[in-house]
Swiss-Prot record:
EC top class, as a word: lyase
UniProt protein name: Fructose-bisphosphate aldolase A
Organism the protein comes from: Rattus norvegicus
Subunit structure as annotated in this protein's UniProt entry: Homotetramer. Interacts with SNX9 and WAS. Interacts with FBP2; the interaction blocks FBP2 inhibition by physiological concentrations of AMP and reduces inhibition by Ca(2+).
Phosphothreonine found at: 9
Entry binding sites for beta-D-fructose 1,6-bisphosphate: 43, 272-274, 301, 304
Highest taxon of source: Eukaryota
Phylogenetic placement of the source organism: Eukaryota, Metazoa, Chordata, Craniata, Vertebrata
Length: 364
């Protein structure tokens, strides 16, 4: 067994751990506002709004400048490259706006999924080339954490061991590079909800994928206390005819995490995976009420599940700004309660709260 070559100094480790804990402080989660230009185009199209840089800026500003009621709810915001360099109407750069509200600035650093030859339509994620230099620059420009998404599909013969291994290794390489540059990596191995598989199959696959991810992180000497995990919840496939309760989903999810995620990891920030706004909050609440020992913060890193009602209320019209912000605040407050196991569904909900946000074969 070789001797360890220290990858990080004690000071570097402390900085990373502190950042990670700030993001997942009690009651806090993450706003994922890192949709690529192509993805935000679909959101804007859904409300009949043109995909211009100004519309994108205005919409992100709407979310980032919601009043102080969101401050105790949002520990971090993930931005797309373009957004990191945009400014609010008052001239403040967006990172400054986020920090002034007590949030940590995050940046999406992957370059999207690409086909993995020799597999049945499986993918890996590109973007390792030049990543160290980009991280160094992003750190200077105010970002303290990053996100990298890998995607796996459940099918008769998927995910293959090749896809699991390759994606685990690419996540570990990314995480290691981020930490060298003072950036906390969010590790996102998303298992898509496409398919007719049941809850048990999703749980089994989730366990295998997470076990591989943490083995790779160990092999690459990644400092776990300075990372976060962004997994899917364990849910049945969208085409599964059998219905499962929120408690069953919570139990399967927490069981899978307990079997695979070391307690050194400070927090698990679930992706919403096309669940409706309300469903994402109810499931997160059930996960936090699950009667098993949970050594990590279990919170949210939601995109559509925080934004859908706000987007609809805005409708691309400046005069709807306040109404849209109210919808966003409503979801932020709901999820802040849910990550503490204190959410009671109100029945009254936002403009799009119960609409399914599922997109088949979702690519950002």
């Amino acid at each position: 067994m070789p001797h360890p070559y220290p990858a990080l100094t004690p000071e570097q480790k402390k900085e990373l751990a502190d950042i990670a804990h700030r993001i997942v402080a009690p009651g806090k989660g993450i706003l994922a506002a890192d949709e690529s230009t192509g993805s935000i185009a679909k959101r804007l199209q859904s409300i009949g709004t043109e995909n211009t840089e100004e519309n994108r800026r205005f919409y992100r500003q709407l979310l980032l400048t919601a009043d102080d009621r969101v401050n105790p709810c949002i520990g971090g915001v993930i931005l797309f490259h373009e957004t990191l360099y945009q400014k609010a109407d008052d001239g403040r750069p967006f990172p400054q706006v986020i920090k002034s509200k007590g949030g940590v600035v995050g940046i999406k650093v992957d370059k999207g999924v690409v086909p993995l030859a020799g597999t049945n339509g499986e993918t890996t994620t590109q973007g390792l080339d030049g990543l160290s230099e980009r991280c160094a620059q992003y750190k200077k420009d105010g970002a303290d954490f990053a996100k990298w998404r890998c995607v796996l599909k459940i099918g008769e013969h998927t995910p293959s061991s090749l896809a699991i291994m390759e994606n685990a290794n690419v996540l570990a390489r990314y995480a290691s590079i981020c930490q060298q540059n003072g950036i906390v990596p969010i590790v996102e191995p998303e298992i898509l909800p496409d398919g007719d598989h049941d809850l048990k199959r999703c749980q089994y696959v989730t366990e295998k994928v997470l076990a591989a991810v943490y083995k790779a992180l160990s092999d690459h000497h990644v400092y776990l206390e300075g990372t976060l995990l962004k997994p899917n919840m364990v849910t049945p496939g969208h085409a599964c005819t059998q219905k499962f309760s929120n408690e069953e989903i919570a139990m399967a999810t927490v069981t899978a995490l307990r079997r695979t995620v070391p307690p050194a990891v400070p927090g698990v920030t679930f992706l919403s995976g096309g669940q409706s706004e309300e469903e994402a909050s109810i499931n997160l609440n059930a996960i936090n009420k699950c009667p098993l020992l949970k050594p990590w913060a279990l919170t949210f890193s939601y995109g559509r599940a925080l934004q859908a009602s706000a987007l609809k209320a805005w409708g691309g019209k400046k005069e709807n700004l306040k109404a849209a912000q109210e919808e966003y605040i409503k979801r932020a407050l709901a999820n802040s309660l849910a990550c503490q196991g204190k959410y009671t569904p109100s029945g009254q909900s936002g403009a799009a709260a119960s609409e399914s946000l599922f997109i088949s074969n979702h690519a950002y």
